[in-house]
UniProtKB/Swiss-Prot annotation:
The lineage of its organism: Bacteria, Pseudomonadati, Pseudomonadota, Gammaproteobacteria, Enterobacterales. It is a multi-pass membrane protein. The chain crosses the membrane at residues 1-21, 37-57, 68-88, 111-131, 147-167, 179-199. The gene is argO. It is found in: Cell inner membrane. It catalyses: L-arginine(in) = L-arginine(out). It holds the Pfam family LysE. It comes from Salmonella schwarzengrund (strain CVM19633). Keywords: Amino-acid transport, Cell inner membrane, Cell membrane, Membrane, Transmembrane, Transmembrane helix, Transport. Its main location: membrane. This is Arginine exporter protein ArgO. HAMAP family: ArgO.
Length: 211
């Protein structure tokens, strides 16, 4: 059964490594050393819920509800555009240190709310956990399925805590105005690229619904 665990671990790692809103947010909180371990834990726990739901039957709900899929997609597009705009606005600020200081003033609950939005309003999360993991894990018998799910969940915990701790460790180098500007530009551009990609998928979903 351990082979199913490592299959899940490898697949989970491959899906979580690319830069996305979740990873960008965890990285930024790590650089600021601001609730970064709490955010890593909440991201991992969110993945635990989503992965479990996808592998143990939740994928059917999303696949059988095209309107729900379209709603999730366009909600994600709106959020990613807003998130990317915020990152680019900070990067282009004439006083980057002042803009960064304003971000640092954010309270714990606002940071948690942003993390929840970054995770739960990201359509790629549902496609990865419900569609990809759901289709693969759903074909397994119950015992292998549990080991497969445990592997993918382990990948999330290892990655988010590793990313948060690494970013915090590199914070002295990454907190400079130049590094922050580059990071924010990179995050903003990536968020907008993902948003435009999702918008194309959203148009395809809407076209399928009305034809």
């Amino acid at each position: 059964m351990i082979s199913y665990y490592f299959q899940g671990l490898a697949l989970g790692a491959a899906m979580i490594l690319p830069l996305g809103p979740q990873n960008a947010f965890v990285m930024n909180q790590g650089i600021r050393r601001q609730y970064h371990l709490m955010i890593a834990l909440l991201c991992a726990l969110s993945d635990l819920v989503l992965i479990s739901a996808g592998i143990f039957g939740g994928s059917a709900l999303l696949m059988q509800s095209p309107w729900l899929l379209a709603l999730v997609t366009w909600g994600g597009v709106a959020f990613l555009l807003w998130y990317g705009f915020g990152a680019l606005k900070t990067a282009m600020s004439s006083n980057l240190e002042l803009a960064s200081a304003e971000v640092m003033k954010q309270g714990r609950w606002k940071i948690i709310a942003t993390m929840l939005a970054v995770t739960w309003l990201n359509p790629h999360v549902y496609l990865d956990t419900f569609v990809v993991l759901g289709s693969l894990g759903g074909q397994l018998a119950m015992e292998p399925k549990r080991w497969f799910a445990l592997g993918t969940i382990s990948a999330s915990f290892l990655w988010f805590f590793g990313l948060a701790l690494l970013a915090a460790w590199l914070a002295p180098r990454l907190r400079t105005a130049k590094a922050q500007r580059i990071i924010n530009i990179l995050v903003g551009v990536v968020m907008w690229l993902i948003a435009f990609q999702l918008a194309r998928e959203g148009v395809a979903h809407m076209h399928a619904l009305f034809n």
